[in-house]
Amino acid sequence: MSIRARVEDAEFLWKHERYEGAFLSALSAVAATARLRYPDRKTTKDGDAFRQFLKGGKGGELGVEFRGDVHSIEHIFYKWLRCELVHEGGLPVDIQFMPDASPGALSIRAGGKPEFILKLSHGWFHYLLSLVANAPENRGVFEQ
């Protein structure tokens, strides 16, 4: 299987409203692309490669309050989305997806009482796929 197949799987699952599976496939494509960018497993662990790849996709640092601490968005995607989906088979109960406020918006809602739920807009899914598709490491992979 290839990174392109992971992206196609993600898009198929998303179209059929299987959001967790779609995110898992998208995050798998991110992880595989990150490993292409940072191939030395001795100097760069999987989680570090994943976070560094995501950090390279945007300017600045985005911190989000979650579970009583402020975490980078890259850490949230790695620890509480990628790792939970891979190792536990689902998202934590305190993370949910929400529709975009406007098309393509990257929104995060860190809820306080009574919910204490972190909500991520659908735009994040599309953002992850665009990072993978536009990564120099994947040049030619997505061209028809």
Name what the model sees in each region.
Residues 55-144:
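Long, charged low-complexity segments
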Residues 1-53, 69-73, 77, 87, ...:
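Amphipathic alpha-helical interface elements
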